[in-house]
A protein has these predicted regions:
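A conserved acidic beta->alpha catalytic loop
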Residues: 48-56, 101
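Short beta-strand-to-loop acidic/aromatic patch adjacent to the donor-nucleotide binding site
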Residues: 91-100
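N-proximal low-complexity "stem/linker" segments adjacent to membrane-targeting elements
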Residues: 1-36
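Acidic helix N-cap motif at the loop->helix transition within catalytic regions
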Residues: 28-32, 53-62
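Residues at the starts of beta-strands that form the adenosine-phosphate
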Residues: 16, 43, 199
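Conserved sequence signature across two-component system core domains
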Residues: 23, 47-49, 69
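Catalytic donor-sugar/metal-binding loop of nucleotide-sugar-dependent glycosyltransferases
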Residues: 157, 178-181, 190-208
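Acceptor/aglycone-binding surface of glycosyltransferases and processive sugar-polymer synthases
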Residues: 71-88, 105-183, 209-235
Length: 237
């Protein structure tokens, strides 16, 4: 799983809903993101995926549990580590949440409520039935292509197959095994939803694109990499 730097006591209230954040060189934003979640009473685990900056230290100071990968394994592997950590610590619900400030912490409750309201295993955030503030046109095209590819290969039709904002029941989390270490893990999760016949609902969420998040993850090379990883992931299984 990696080296654990901290295990602070869970805050009062909502202690069975764990927030999992995969982070790589996010020292600039991770403290603010962790605090935005902690103030709402959720325990948080940050998986520092081999960062070269102060990500782990900043997250620890902000009050997160921190698990460190000695080397960078990719977002999929970091999420797998975080989900297992949360389940091990008696999470009844696991929420995956981005480290770069794109997600809104005040929408976590909407996501977790959707699990019970719709009696589903997964609540998946969608920026296309919600809002995508400042999204680049290239990113829209890439995400639409990824959603189409995912629908064709899994039979699960979603508007936003690559949204990192998810709420997952404990039972579903224990069955989830992420093998794709890079961005294709998102479609792999949908593939497992189909394989295990798990129930899913999409929930409108707001994704805010900032100069920081655009520099971090919205390059053309990353968009192309998503599609390459999807293709390679399918032919290798």
């Amino acid at each position: 799983m990696g080296m654990t730097l901290s295990a602070p006591a869970a805050p009062p209230g909502r202690a069975d809903i764990w927030i999992v954040i995969a982070a790589f060189n996010e020292g600039t934003m991770i403290g603010e993101v962790v605090r935005s979640v902690k103030v709402r009473g959720y325990p948080v685990v940050v998986v520092d995926d081999g960062s070269h900056d102060s990500t782990a230290e900043v997250a620890l100071h902000a009050g997160a549990h921190v698990v460190v990968h000695p080397i960078n394994l990719g977002q999929g592997a970091a999420l797998q580590t975080g989900i297992k950590y949360a389940v091990h610590n008696d999470a009844h619900v696991v929420v995956t949440f981005d480290a770069d400030g794109q997600h809104a912490a005040d929408e976590i409750e909407r996501m977790t409520d959707a699990l019970a309201t719709h009696n589903v295993d997964f609540a998946l955030g969608s920026r296309f039935i919600g809002q995508a503030v400042g999204i680049p046109k290239l990113r829209v095209l890439t995400l639409k292509a990824a959603a189409l590819f995912t629908w064709i290969t899994t039979g699960v039709r979603l508007t936003d197959a690559h949204n990192g904002f998810r709420a997952i029941t404990r039972d579903a989390a224990t069955r989830l095994e992420i093998y794709q270490n890079r961005m294709a893990h998102a479609s792999e999760i949908v593939s497992q939803i189909a394989k295990h016949k798990m129930r899913v609902v999409e929930v409108p969420v707001t994704i805010t694109y900032t100069d920081y998040s655009l520099r971090k993850g919205q390059k053309l090379s990353n968009s192309v990499r998503i599609l390459i990883d999807l293709f390679l992931g399918r032919i290798s299984r």
